[in-house]
Amino acid sequence: MNAELIVQLGSLALITVAGPAIIVLLFLKQGNL
């Protein structure tokens, strides 16, 4: 496998996981206020 492909898959997976996580954290912060 190419290193570029691994990097793209890794970044895509990171965005897929981090996206909803950030939204949940922001929602919880607003909820606690």
Swiss-Prot record:
UniProt-annotated location(s): Plastid, Chloroplast thylakoid membrane
Superkingdom field: Eukaryota
GO biological process, one term: photosynthesis
Pfam families for this protein: PSII_Ycf12
Keywords from the UniProt entry: Chloroplast, Membrane, Photosynthesis, Photosystem II, Plastid, Thylakoid, Transmembrane, Transmembrane helix
Positions of transmembrane segments: 5-25
UniProt membrane topology term: Single-pass membrane protein
Cellular compartments per GO CC: chloroplast thylakoid membrane; photosystem II
Main location: plastid
InterPro entries per UniProt: PSII_Ycf12_core-subunit
Assembly: PSII is composed of 1 copy each of membrane proteins PsbA, PsbB, PsbC, PsbD, PsbE, PsbF, PsbH, PsbI, PsbJ, PsbK, PsbL, PsbM, PsbT, PsbY, PsbZ, Psb30/Ycf12, peripheral proteins of the oxygen-evolving complex and a large number of cofactors. It forms dimeric complexes.
Function: A core subunit of photosystem II (PSII), probably helps stabilize the reaction center.
HAMAP family cross-referenced by the UniProt entry: PSII_Psb30_Ycf12
Family classification: Belongs to the Psb30/Ycf12 family.
Name of the protein in its database record: Photosystem II reaction center protein Psb30
Organism: Euglena stellata
